């Protein structure tokens, strides 16, 4: 049992060091001296009786204990900010511009309606919503919050899981009447595959797993596009086999307009909110992430238990 609890300001110092990459940069962000930052980290390490950071000529790195402390610190500081907002009623209504990015298909079908509802609840917000057919850089593309259908998130971003999702193989019954349904991934090379080149997808390569192994399959066909909506329409018209997100094809599977192919295989493609700064720093960012999480969970299902907004 600890003799004293870690102070919120010391946890904030740790978070700032991780995000800025150095003690001096963290000090500048906090408006303090490097000596102050060093002292607060020493106090935090003494309080927890463990080393949190390793310093070298190449920079600063978290220890295993430091990584755990950092993750909890993000959660604690976000909860602390909620407490301050609720009790003091200061800035309880988020305001100002927030720039949100997303892919075309999911952006139009889910995020755009969610933003409409968001604005009803928080009319003081201003939202600029931009759709991309490529992976973006939050800084270079000037985006505060990016909604990504991709599990490979760079570690210099913060990511919050909105909901689970996977991509599955589908085709129309009309197509499968003309051509024998593939019985293995290798047989996909004999089929007309509708290739999509969206934000995170490598053109002509499908990464598929069955829970035991993952394989890369090279596919081709007469039709390809950077629009998932167009590829879905081609599949419905019986033009070939496609790999699409479950949220996009589920209504057509239920109606019988599409049939799942090789159902034991799928591609993990969870839906994430991705941003640069911890949520405790920005009420408008926190409100947007929490609202979109609730929106997606209500319509697409909740992710696994145990995650936190950070």
UniProtKB/Swiss-Prot annotation:
DNA-binding segment(s): 23-42
GO biological process: DNA-templated transcription
Segments forming a coiled coil: none
The keyword Signal is assigned to this record: no
Sample GO molecular function, one term: DNA-binding transcription factor activity
Annotated keywords: Activator, DNA-binding, Transcription, Transcription regulation
Keyword Cell division belongs to the record: no
PROSITE patterns, alphabetized: HTH_LYSR (PS50931)
CDD domains: PBP2_CrgA_like_9
Residues of the HTH lysR-type domain: 6-63
Biological function: Positive regulator required for L-tartrate-dependent anaerobic growth on glycerol. Induces expression of the ttdA-ttdB-ygjE operon.
Family indicated by similarity: Belongs to the LysR transcriptional regulatory family.
Protein name from the UniProt record: HTH-type transcriptional activator TtdR
Organism ancestry: Bacteria, Pseudomonadati, Pseudomonadota, Gammaproteobacteria, Enterobacterales
């Amino acid at each position: 049992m600890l003799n004293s609890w870690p102070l919120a300001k010391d946890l904030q110092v740790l978070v700032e060091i991780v995000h800025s990459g150095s003690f001096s940069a963290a000090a500048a962000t906090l408006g303090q001296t490097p000596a102050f930052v060093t002292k607060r980290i020493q106090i935090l390490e003494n309080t927890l009786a463990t080393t949190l950071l390793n310093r070298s000529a190449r920079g600063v790195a978290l220890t295993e204990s430091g990584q755990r402390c950092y993750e909890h610190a993000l959660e604690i500081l976000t909860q602390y900010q909620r407490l301050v907002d609720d009790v003091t009623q200061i800035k309880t209504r988020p305001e100002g511009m927030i720039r949100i990015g997303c892919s075309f298909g999911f952006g139009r079908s889910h995020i755009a309606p969610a933003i409409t509802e968001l604005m009803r609840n928080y009319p003081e917000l201003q939202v600029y919503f931009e759709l991309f057919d490529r992976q973006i850089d939050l800084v270079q593309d000037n985006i505060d919050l990016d909604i990504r259908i991709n599990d490979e998130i760079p570690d210099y971003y913060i990511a919050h899981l909105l909901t689970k999702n996977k991509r599955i193989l589908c085709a129309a019954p009309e197509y499968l009447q003309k051509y024998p349904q593939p019985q293995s991934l290798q047989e996909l090379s004999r089929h007309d595959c509708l290739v999509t080149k969206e934000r995170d997808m490598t053109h002509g390569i499908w990464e598929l797993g069955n829970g035991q192994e993952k394989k890369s399959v090279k596919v081709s066909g007469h039709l390809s596009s950077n629009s998932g909506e167009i590829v879905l329409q081609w599949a419905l018209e019986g033009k070939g086999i496609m790999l699409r997100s479950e949220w996009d094809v589920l209504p057509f599977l239920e109606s019988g307009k599409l049939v799942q192919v090789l159902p034991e295989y799928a591609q993990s493609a969870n839906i994430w909110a991705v941003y640069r700064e911890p949520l405790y720093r920005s009420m408008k960012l926190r409100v947007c992430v929490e609202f979109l999480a609730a929106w997606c969970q209500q319509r697409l299902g909740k992710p696994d238990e145990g995650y936190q907004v950070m």
